[in-house]
Amino acid sequence: MNQANFYIAGDWGTSNLRLYLVDTISGQCAATKSGPGISQVNANEIPDLLARLCEPWLQQHNISYSIYCGMVGSTIGWADAGYLDCPLDLNSLANKLCSPPNANMRSQIIPGVRCNSPTGATDVMRGEETQILGAIQKSPELLFGKHLLCLPGTHNKWVALKDGVVESFITSVCGELFSSLTKHSVLTRGATTSEFDKQYFIDGVIRSSEQRRTDLIHLLFETRSRQLGGQLPQKASADFLSGLIIGRDLLGACDLYSQVRLNTSVKIIADSSLSDLYALAGDQLDIPTDCLDGQELSRMGIHSLYRAANAL
């Protein structure tokens, strides 16, 4: 059993690293740090990088354990932690933690999750599994019946739960699509950063619903043509585009998982900057939503696995 007062938890994705100093008993976060994403670090540099980032914590506290989720456990990370297959009780992740090489303390990496998606293809996640586990702990009603969860981000995850077990999920590339189109296409070219325009976002959501029979690929250029026709201010073009993409994401996922979502709200797990957009879109589409804080749930999920792995 780990007798230290604190341990280090890390959510280490491709682009960013978030480190948490966590109380071993309560699971409360005492401090945070950030660092480079795993794509910016060589695997053999990771132990020294963590030592530098965590040095103040290590000097002040008796810390002998760290645990990580995300792309740190991929083939481009510190060590390949593999995947566990669905259907999956996420508590079983604690039995398959991976120990990376050359660690400066006892360290473990949480595996990812793999499934056959509703379209029949293989799909995978890394990092989101801890948020889902945290959501189940925070909202015990997820242990009973069928529920649909949405975890927005660069690659959104739509997750079907049945009695607290992950049955399947599917990925939508909404975040990456929006980023690519706003940075590398003519659709929003010339638009300057401005305050969020709620009405034009809603217009995009409604348009995505009105033209539900039309493929999204045939709607996207309206972001440009509406500007040329005087129907859409250039400064609001990104908000209209966001509404189109998010609206269609919600509609498509709810169609795929129509039997999962019966009589239940969609749980949106993300930072408020994203979850608020999905909730607003859901309001326009008559899709009820509940928003949960992604970072809080990630810490809760990691802490649950920490306690299981250390027999607390």
Q: What are the residue ranges of the model-derived segments?
A:
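Short glycine-rich, Thr/Ser-proximal phosphate-binding strand/loop in the N-terminal lobe
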Residues: 6-45, 292
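Adenine-nucleotide phosphate-binding core of ATP-dependent small-molecule kinases
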Residues: 209-252
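Glycine-rich phosphate-binding loops at beta-strand->alpha-helix junctions
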Residues: 16, 262-281
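Short beta-strand-loop/turn "lid" adjacent to the catalytic site in phosphate-handling enzymes
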Residues: 57-122, 163
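Glycine-rich phosphate-binding loop plus the immediately following alpha-helix
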Residues: 41-42, 115-209
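Short glycine-aspartate micro-motif
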Residues: 7-11, 65-69, 147-151, 267
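N-terminal phosphate-binding loop and adjacent alpha-helix
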Residues: 29-65, 73-76, 80, 189-190
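Glycine-rich phosphate-binding/hydrolytic loop that grips phosphoryl groups
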Residues: 280, 290-312
